[in-house]
Amino acid sequence: MNLEDIYRDAGAYLKGHFLLSSANHSEYYLQSAKVLENPILAGKLADELFEVIKNAGVEFDSVCSPALGGILAGYELARAGAKRFIFTERVEKVMSLRRGFSVAKGEKFIICEDIITTGGSALESAKIIEELGGVVVGFAALANRGFCKVHNMRNEGKSSCKLPADKPLFALGNFEFEIYTPEECPLCKTGSKAIKPGSRGN
């Protein structure tokens, strides 16, 4: 299953000038919602991701995703493994666990996103789980944007990755796009204005 082809076929591999949730800019953006709007395809991707985690010997009880982008991917991963699913969400810009969700002491979690860039939102979710007595055994995503090392791939992680080095990240694909600070962005220097398509913008 070629993830890049899947994103292109779904119209989810976007080219333009994008403002990322990290406040950095990129010429490319992966709009996973366009892939996950197809329940059959979403299920197939989640089944494959679950098999990757299972084959690595990582056992978990539940899946937690940061809202909004990670919810569909995380729910489908939980379905694939017949696990419980919960999600965290931002309340006044602070990641929180609400809606009656609870975490049992020692409960093992995979934190699942649709896309991992630097892993900031996933790390925020992981900290909440651990503060409540849960155990984060790994991270998962449909796609990695090239900053974090993926356990089931041969890419090298970068210093900007925020995920802990002692916990594995599993993904179905690795996309390496150039990302720029607003001050260094060559697209801005041509007069182009970045648009914000991501989860924190709309």
From Swiss-Prot:
Binding site for 5-phospho-alpha-D-ribose 1-diphosphate: K93, E113, D114, I115, I116, T117, T118, G119, G120, S121
GO terms for MF: magnesium ion binding; orotate phosphoribosyltransferase activity
Cofactor: Mg(2+)
Pathway involvement of the protein, from the record: Pyrimidine metabolism; UMP biosynthesis via de novo pathway; UMP from orotate: step 1/2
Pfam family, one: Pribosyltran
Keywords (A to Z) from UniProt: Glycosyltransferase, Magnesium, Pyrimidine biosynthesis, Transferase
One annotated GO biological process: pyrimidine nucleobase biosynthetic process
Positions contributing to orotate binding: T117, R145
Catalyzed reaction equations: orotidine 5'-phosphate + diphosphate = orotate + 5-phospho-alpha-D-ribose 1-diphosphate
Record-linked InterPro entries: OPRT, Orotate_PRibTrfase_bac, PRibTrfase_dom, PRTase-like
Enzyme Commission numbers on file: 2.4.2.10
Transmembrane feature ranges: none
Described function: Catalyzes the transfer of a ribosyl phosphate group from 5-phosphoribose 1-diphosphate to orotate, leading to the formation of orotidine monophosphate (OMP).
Subunit structure: Homodimer.
Family affiliation: Belongs to the purine/pyrimidine phosphoribosyltransferase family. PyrE subfamily.
PANTHER family: OROTATE PHOSPHORIBOSYLTRANSFERASE, URIDINE 5'-MONOPHOSPHATE SYNTHASE
Protein name: Orotate phosphoribosyltransferase
